[in-house]
Regions:
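A conserved acidic, glycine/proline-rich C-terminal tail/linker
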Residues: 210-238
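Catalytic-core "active-site belt" of small-molecule-metabolizing enzymes
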Residues: 2-205, 242, 246, 254-262
Length: 262
């Protein structure tokens, strides 16, 4: 690791305050030129620990940068991950205030709701499908505590993979009842089609991303628990949202999900 414990704590505090005050900070990679990936995960886990001490509960996890184009843009060869707390996960038709975020964007994903524990390494796609009770259409609201989304890979890792909120649809399906690779999705903003995509864009199959995360977390001594929600990554490019927007999204075979921004 390139940062001292004091620098790591300073960086974690800066991100935490940015989220609370909605005042973004300069990229950590600029303020701490020696910041590496392990430092970045150390910063993320420091803030996770603080939230757990404050009484919050981890409800699941997210995978970011599952699209090869995004990884190429940041010069990395693997995705990243973040933690999802109970306070972040909401049901469809959720309403948000734009004032609660800095520069929010939305993505479309197929959320995996687990019925069994999973602990890597050694987890396969088949293991993931057997352990999944339901796959739901979901909107992930992402937000960067780094000003102007000027992020390097280490910045978004430290910033909990830019996680903010997850909105889950009400229907869904068993992943054993459809071929998720072929499921297409669409996201509308104020009635206008903004983005379309296919789940094959998520590492070939969203369950591949879930297996990757189970194995990555397993090497850190973390396991999925029954009831966890795992967000495998978006099938579309992120769409900016602002006050007054109404978002509708749908995934073939899974249903739809909505949110409005007040």
């Amino acid at each position: 690791m390139g940062l001292s414990s004091e620098e790591l704590e300073q960086a974690a505090h800066a991100l935490s305050q940015a989220e609370k005050t909605r005042a973004p900070i300069v990229p950590l990679t600029e303020k701490f030129p020696g910041l590496d990936v392990e430092d970045a995960y150390g910063i993320q886990l420091h803030n996770v620990s603080d939230r757990l001490k404050a009484g919050e509960t981890v409800r699941g996890y997210k995978v970011g940068l599952t699209a090869k184009a995004m990884r190429d843009q940041l010069g990395v060869d693997q995705p990243d991950f973040g933690h999802l707390f109970s306070s972040m996960i909401l049901d469809t038709e959720a309403q948000f205030s734009a004032k609660d975020f800095i520069a929010p964007r939305v993505e479309l994903e197929a959320a995996f709701v687990l019925s069994k524990d999973l602990k890597g390494p050694g987890i396969t796609v088949a293991d993931v499908l057997r352990a999944t009770e339901l796959v739901l259409p979901a909107i992930e609201l992402i937000d960067s505590r780094i000003e102007n989304w000027k992020i390097a890979f280490e910045d978004t890792v430290a910033d909990n993979a830019s996680a903010a909120r997850v909105i889950l649809g009400a229907q869904g399906a068993s992943p054993r009842d459809l071929d998720l690779r072929l499921a297409g999705g669409a996201l509308f903003r104020n009635g206008s089609l903004m983005e379309t995509g296919s789940m094959v864009a998520v590492m070939g199959h969203p369950a591949v991303a879930v297996a990757w995360l189970a194995n990555t977390l397993g090497r850190r001594g973390i396991s999925f628990k029954a009831g966890d929600v795992v967000m495998p990554g978006s099938c579309i490019k992120a769409v900016d949202i602002r006050q007054g927007d109404v978002i509708h999204a749908e995934i073939a075979g899974l249903g739809c999900v909505d949110l409005s921004v007040s």
